[in-house]
Regions:
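N-terminal mature ectodomain segment of secretory-pathway/periplasmic proteins
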Residues: 1-53, 79-131
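Short amphipathic alpha-helical patches
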Residues: 10-17, 68-69, 164-168
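Non-transmembrane domains of secretory- and envelope-associated proteins
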Residues: 2-9, 97, 106-109, 118-178
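Short glycine- and basic-residue-enriched patches
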Residues: 27, 63-79
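Solvent-exposed, flexible loop/coil residues
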Residues: 59, 74, 82, 96, ...
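Hydrophobic transmembrane alpha-helix bundles
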Residues: 31-44, 75, 166-177
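Acidic/charged, solvent-exposed loop-and-adjacent secondary-structure segments enriched in E/D, K/R, S/T
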Residues: 49-70
């Protein structure tokens, strides 16, 4: 489970993620507010809105999400925009974590604190910080099972089960980390 907070509002989601060779499958169900399930197979993303009987089809941009933003392959290295400081160790959702802080080099960017699981590097918690270091929003796992058995076939079947839904192709808007 992931719990996130922005502007004092809390939301929670349940996430499944599995890798089979070079295929990644993921499902994210919102547990707060309007029901929504998002299923991803590599870069193909489908979001099911059961109340509206709509499913949107989208293509995810490679390199546009964490942790790829920290990779020089994503464009300019993160060090061009941030000073990176190791803050030590902590625990999130029962897992030992390394904590780093990204301090912006200019006034146009937010700062970040990131907790990553020691063994896998999986991001367990993030905080977005203002110029004074105050937390603007945060997201963290509240429960996590690494190496838990996930039925990849069930995730694949959900992507194929669009009967009774109106299919909408999402419009693409290219973004950059800068």
């Amino acid at each position: 489970f992931v719990v996130s907070s922005a502007s004092g509002a809390l939301s929670s989601s349940r996430i499944w993620h599995v890798c089979e060779g070079d295929v990644q499958l993921e499902r994210v169900d919102t547990l707060t507010g309007t029901p929504r399930s998002t299923v991803r197979r590599n870069d193909t993303v489908m979001t099911f809105l059961p109340d509206a009987r709509v499913v949107t089809l989208d293509q995810r941009q490679q390199g546009a999400v964490f942790p790829n933003l920290l990779s020089p392959a994503a464009g300019q290295p993160v060090a061009d925009f941030y000073d990176v400081r190791e803050l030590g160790r902590g625990r999130v959702a029962g897992c030992d974590a390394d904590i780093v802080q990204l301090l912006p080099r200019d006034a146009w960017r937010f700062g970040y604190r990131i907790w990553s699981e020691n063994r896998t590097g999986l991001v367990l918690k993030t905080q977005t910080l203002d110029a004074q270091g105050r937390v603007l929003e945060q997201a963290a796992f509240s429960e996590l099972q690494l190496d838990a058995p996930v039925q990849a076939e069930q995730l694949r079947q959900m992507m194929a089960s669009t009967q009774g839904y109106r299919l909408v192709q999402a419009e693409q808007a290219r973004t950059t980390p800068q």
